[in-house]
Amino acid sequence: MTIIRKKHPLIKIINHSFIDLPTPSNISSWWNFGSLLGLCLIIQILTGLFLAMHYTSDTATAFSSVAHICRDVNYGWLIRYMHANGASMFFICLFLHVGRGIYYGSYNMIETWNMGIILLFAVMATAFMGYVLPWGQMSFWGATVITNLLSAIPYIGTTLVEWIWGGFSVDKATLTRFFAFHFILPFIITALVLVHLLFLHETGSNNPTGLNSDSDKIPFHPYYTVKDFLGVLFLFMAFMILTLFFPDILGDPDNYTPANPLNTPPHIKPEWYFLFAYAILRSIPNKLGGVVALILSILILALMPLLHTSKQRTLTFRPITQTIYWILVADLLTLTWIGGQPVEHPFIIIGQTASIAYFTIIMILMPIAGMIENNILNLD
């Protein structure tokens, strides 16, 4: 068996990635989320495939085809809710994974980090298009509002929006193409994940100390396969409790009303995992400015390696930056809350303050804190 594992051209690639992979001996449970994201992706592809067997991407039948899946297909309700809540679990793991990367300075592995940002954009695009497919009220109006943002692009904006819509409004052509893209993107994401892993295995994993761990490596299997399996159990438990007991808690009640272009819902808002970006978008009165801020709210992650001023890699021994980091986490939670609130006083000013704080913390406070810590520790 060992001979096959180490010599077979295909199996040896798997062996070097998941079995004999030299791994730092001290990585914590925060390093579990990579494998959990892989599991989430597999769950989403499988449940999505079974849903696609019964779904129809036509404005006249899309809503009723989802109802048919829940009522008439064997375990259709389970597949549908696993897919819907699987997206939420996916984003929880994604945010924790990115948060871990920021805390422990993993962004210094630039190729892996940039690949991760591309993956984040791809997953967000996939989730957005998936939300449109049930063709409920929030699906329709969410698609209308978000795609309409592209009209803010000077000169080509309006043409671009109509090109994406396939007409003069969100209609049958839009739904059909969104379904096509929603189906193909997860497979593209899978390919990008392999590239992400390829870059990661070029440098090896980071660890909580941020120090070079070449002198202290252990094989991934059995140590981290067992450790990851514990994470899988916790994820699966949370996922099943969510799916079986509270399947609609993260959804919007408006989406149980079929799409109606003549009736606007009182509060148009995306799924919870986009609310922080939506709050940043809404906090700027100018349309183009809002779109730029929305894109920058994610793209700012690409500046992380350039903004790293500290002589230490991680925040483990840096209490000042640690404090600022947790303020950033609180700020993101505030933005998420604001994104779900109506556009009125005091939510407008809170959203604007939180948006300014978000960019200020990342671009100004964290780099300054890094320099102060270098000074205190005489690392200059």
From Swiss-Prot:
Ranges that cross the membrane: 33-53, 77-98, 113-133, 178-198, 226-246, 288-308, 320-340, 347-367
Superkingdom of origin organism: Eukaryota
Additional facts recorded: Heme 1 (or BL or b562) is low-potential and absorbs at about 562 nm, and heme 2 (or BH or b566) is high-potential and absorbs at about 566 nm.
Needed co-factor(s): heme b
Primary location class: mitochondrion
Entry protein name: Cytochrome b
Positions contributing to heme b b566 binding: 97, 196
Cofactor binding remark: Binds 2 heme b groups non-covalently.
Chain positions recorded as heme b b562 binding sites: 83, 182
Lineage: Eukaryota, Metazoa, Chordata, Craniata, Vertebrata
Entry keyword Metal-binding: yes
Subunit structure: The cytochrome bc1 complex contains 11 subunits: 3 respiratory subunits (MT-CYB, CYC1 and UQCRFS1), 2 core proteins (UQCRC1 and UQCRC2) and 6 low-molecular weight proteins (UQCRH/QCR6, UQCRB/QCR7, UQCRQ/QCR8, UQCR10/QCR9, UQCR11/QCR10 and a cleavage product of UQCRFS1). This cytochrome bc1 complex then forms a dimer.
Key words of the record: Electron transport, Heme, Iron, Membrane, Metal-binding, Mitochondrion, Mitochondrion inner membrane, Respiratory chain, Transmembrane, Transmembrane helix, Transport, Ubiquinone
PANTHER family according to UniProt: CYTOCHROME B
Binding annotation for a ubiquinone: 201
Pfam family for this entry, one: Cytochrom_B_C
Compartments (UniProt record): Mitochondrion inner membrane
Keyword hit for Hydrolase: no
An MF annotation (GO) of this entry: ubiquinol-cytochrome-c reductase activity
Entry membrane topology: Multi-pass membrane protein
The protein's role, per its UniProt record: Component of the ubiquinol-cytochrome c reductase complex (complex III or cytochrome b-c1 complex) that is part of the mitochondrial respiratory chain. The b-c1 complex mediates electron transfer from ubiquinol to cytochrome c. Contributes to the generation of a proton gradient across the mitochondrial membrane that is then used for ATP synthesis.
Database matches in InterPro entries: Cyt_b/b6_C (IPR005798), Cyt_b/b6_C_sf (IPR036150), Cyt_b/b6_N (IPR005797), Cytb/b6-like_sf (IPR027387), Cytochrome_b (IPR030689), Cytochrome_b_C_euk/bac (IPR048260), Cytochrome_b_N_euk/bac (IPR048259), Di-haem_cyt_TM (IPR016174)
